Amino acid sequence: MIFKRFVNLLVFLFLLGAGLLTFFLILSGGRESGTLKNFYWLQADTNGFNSAPSTTRWYNYNWCGYEDGQLANCSSRAPAKPFSPRDNFGNSVNLPSSFRNNRDTYYYLSRVGWAMLLISLFFIVLALVPGFLATFLPFKAVPVLYCVLSWLAFFFIILAACLYTGCYVKARKTFRNSGRSARLGPKNFAFIWTSVFLMLVNAIWSTIFSATHKAHSTYSDHDMYAQYESPSVDTGAQMEKSTYNSGATDGAGPITAAPVVGQPQPTTTTTPAGNGKFFQKLKTRKQVPSAELEPAGDGGLAGPVTVRD
């Protein structure tokens, strides 16, 4: 039991870590300075795309030109800013054909990936409460809820990772095929795939914890039920016997037990009050000593022998 609690607390830290990494991913592009400027999805050479900067970085909320380690000429911020060079800079003869012909592919992959990222963070936050309580509370519903929320969070985080990876890896390949430099943002992709790994471990352990917790609770219930079936409890016949043989009185005489169906009842005879003839006969009857009995011819006792003075 101690080992299970230790592992559950350790995996709970994994859940916290996944939530923290996902939160940083959502903040990508929230500011144009500081640490957040290094959390980008793709950096590529966009020179010649109409009025686009020579080097562009794409974030969650906008895209910015990158020169001499600083961001400049950023676009307006908007949630789930789509990755689509055709929409970002307009159509151009220098724009690779894949961005013109497959515009919807890049557009919806980036936007749906953002939505899946938000949903995964929502389920991660929900899983924190039962994940912590499952270590200390014996209720069966808590580990089951923890397991369900963990698998939902894992499903949406891996879906977001696949959508983002598919979108920007395809874009990097398109840029490089056109003779332009392009690279993925190392921090963003490291964070999102690390979150996938942490949530996978969390989901697997929550399933094991829920299954073992349920089996232990079932065994305890069986033991509790067995106590009620213990032979130490008096049976109905024993209770009837003890009640019948009881000598307790209520002040007016002995308590008579209720008759039991199917059991022969003892019969008693009573002598009417004031009738003393029975006791008078007992007084006049004389018991004859055994020494005064005369032996019979057949070895028995013939009867009393009269002794005369």
From Swiss-Prot:
- Please give the residue ranges for the topological domain Extracellular: 27-116, 162-188
Tell me yes or no: is Chaperone among this UniProt entry's keywords: no
Localisation: Cell membrane
Q: Which UniProt keywords apply?
A: Cell membrane, Glycoprotein, Membrane, Phosphoprotein, Sporulation, Stress response, Transmembrane, Transmembrane helix
- The Phosphothreonine modification is found at 235
Q: Specify where the region named Disordered lies, as residue ranges.
A: 253-309
Show the stretches that span the lipid bilayer: 6-26, 117-137, 141-161, 189-209
Provide the glycosylation site positions: 73
Q: What is its main location?
A: membrane
Q: What induces it?
A: By osmotic and salt stresses.
Positions of post-translational Phosphoserine modification:
230, 232
- Which membrane topology term applies here? Multi-pass membrane protein
**A Pfam family that the UniProt record links to this protein:** SUR7
Q: Name one GO cellular component term.
A: membrane raft
Topological domain (Cytoplasmic) residues are 1-5, 138-140, 210-309
Alphabetical list of InterPro entries matching this protein? SUR7/Rim9-like_fungi (IPR009571)
What biological process terms from GO does the record include? ascospore formation; cortical actin cytoskeleton organization; endocytosis; fungal-type cell wall organization; septin cytoskeleton organization
What ranges does the record list as Low complexity composition bias? 258-274
Recorded family membership: Belongs to the SUR7 family.
Q: Which PANTHER family match?
A: PROTEIN SUR7, SUR7 FAMILY PROTEIN FMP45
What's this chain's function?
Answer: Involved in sporulation and affects the sphingolipid composition of the plasma membrane.
What's the miscellaneous note? Present with 329 molecules/cell in log phase SD medium.
UniProt-recorded name of the protein: SUR7 family protein FMP45
Q: Which organism is it from?
A: Saccharomyces cerevisiae (strain ATCC 204508 / S288c)
Q: Name the lineage.
A: Eukaryota, Fungi, Dikarya, Ascomycota, Saccharomycotina
